Amino acid sequence: MEILMSITAGVLFMVGTYLILTKSLLRVVVGLILLSHGAHLLLLTMAGLQRGAPPLLHLEATTYSDPLPQALILTAIVISFGVTSFLLVLAYRTYKEHKTDDLDQLRGSADE
């Protein structure tokens, strides 16, 4: 299962990097979203997957599984949601202002 999750994280990184390098502003935002999802999946995979294991392993509660990776991923998801919404607002305002989402046209020429 961890192999499949690692491959999926790699595919998300690959597609996210490809989309970041394109000319469309919306594709860049989607690429950043996929890159952050790949990072979340990688962190979850690195924590180790235990199918059906409860957080408390015994009733005595002296040994328990580590909740830190899940808390870290939850925090990262909330932060990436805020960054994504901010990037979407910036992309929308840029499109409304310049009437294009092509990064080459937004960059301008050397004469300007």
Swiss-Prot record:
Protein name: Na(+)/H(+) antiporter subunit C
Broad class of where this protein is predominantly found: membrane
Task performed by this protein: Mnh complex is a Na(+)Li(+)/H(+) antiporter involved in Na(+) and/or Li(+) excretion and Na(+) resistance. Na(+)/H(+) antiport consumes a transmembrane electrical potential, and is thus inferred to be electrogenic. Does not transport K(+), Ca(2+) or Mg(2+).
Matches recorded under InterPro entries: CPA3_antiporter_subunitC, NUOK/Mnh_C1-like
Similarity-based family: Belongs to the CPA3 antiporters (TC 2.A.63) subunit C family.
Annotated TM spans: 4-21, 28-50, 70-92
Extra information: Mrp-dependent antiport apparently occurs by a secondary, proton motive force-dependent mechanism, but the similarity of several Mrp proteins to membrane-embedded subunits of energy-coupled NADH dehydrogenase complexes raises the possibility that there is a capacity for electron transport that could provide a primary energy coupling option for Mrp functions.
Domain of life: Bacteria
Cellular compartment(s): Cell membrane
Membrane topology value: Multi-pass membrane protein
Assembly notes: Forms a heterooligomeric complex that consists of seven subunits: MrpA, MrpB, MrpC, MrpD, MrpE, MrpF and MrpG.
PANTHER family hit by this protein: ANTIPORTER SUBUNIT MNHC2-RELATED
Source species: Alkalihalophilus pseudofirmus (strain ATCC BAA-2126 / JCM 17055 / OF4)
UniProtKB keywords: Antiport, Cell membrane, Hydrogen ion transport, Ion transport, Membrane, Sodium, Sodium transport, Transmembrane, Transmembrane helix, Transport
GO biological process annotation, one example: sodium ion transport
Cross-referenced Pfam families: Oxidored_q2
Keyword Thylakoid: no
Keyword Transmembrane: yes
MF (Gene Ontology): antiporter activity
Disulfide feature: none
Gene Ontology, cellular component aspect: plasma membrane
